[in-house]
Amino acid sequence: MNKKVVILGGGTGTSTLVRGLKQFPVDISVVVSVCDDGKSTGKLREEFDIPAVGDLRKVIASLSDTEPLFESLLEYRFNTNSDLNGHAVGNLLLAALCNITGNMSDGIKSLSKVLNLKGKVLPLTEDNVVLMGLMQDGSTVEGEHNITESKKRIKDIYYKKNPVINPEVIEDIKQADMIILSMGSLYTSIACDLISKDVTDAIDASKGKILYVCNMFTQPGETDDFTVSDHVQVLNSYLGKRKIESLIINDGKIPKKFINKYHREEDKDPVVIDKSNLNNMNLKIIKDDFVTLDLGSLKHDAIKLSLKIFEEIIN
């Protein structure tokens, strides 16, 4: 029987992870935060009163086992002067299926059959949630997009109204052999999955190991100047009684030209590995060179990363 893995996250980082992990003999459930409110997703949320679909779409595309053309179709964005401008086909498809089936979870299950998904994709909630940010300067910012765009340091996040958590999320977490906090936006993709007590209670009740894959670069508006231990401390502050047990970090050399490029164009810098702080955190630290180049962007090597995770799962 395959080991059960629950991944909490969303967006590009989680998509990279599942693209590799689906190649291994594990049962994957991906819990996706649904508080994104920018671009196409924001328009659809406002018009149809549905959970955010953008991160769900990315993870579904990465888990699919079908013709590459279908994955390209899900990710295709219209560039037109009409009302379709900026919308991704996958976002429209999920919005339509949500209306047809009556909820997002059933809509995703219908699409999963068509795309032969190598795992489950679970929205954290069916509610049209609004993420709130309490900033270090005492101000409050409403909405995920506004939180990151405010360029203020985040002190805390919470939901404007506490959502009803998807029961399948709770059940899968309790049965998991490993719970992975994915690389990705620290507050708006991962921590926002942990701010519900129902989720942290389920993690506390689970016997699954808690593993965190740290980002390679900081993210403007969320983790400026953060070290690896800063990332861990933030996530541990949102977890319940149980904390992160294993940590995967990249110690591969990042080419100088990419460090300069990311700093200049995106205001991102490599996350510093602060060994002295990490050594005092009671963590199993797994280091390797995970750097790879994909279409001109630096990413974690999905297969190499997944192999390390699989070794942890079976040990």
Predicted regions and their residues:
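Extreme N-terminal starter segment of soluble prokaryotic enzymes
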Residues: 1-5
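Short glycine/serine/threonine-rich phosphate/pyrophosphate-binding segments
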Residues: 13-18, 183, 188-195
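A short helix->loop->beta-strand "cap" motif at the edges of active sites that frequently abuts
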Residues: 25-26, 206-210, 244, 283
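C-terminal functional extensions of proteins
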Residues: 228-315
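Short internal beta-strands
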Residues: 29-33, 209-216, 245-252
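Active-site gating loop/helix substructures
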Residues: 127-183
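Electropositive, gly/pro-rich neighborhoods at or near active sites that engage anionic ligands
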Residues: 35-151, 308-311
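Charged helix-capping and loop-helix junction motifs
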Residues: 193-200, 226-231
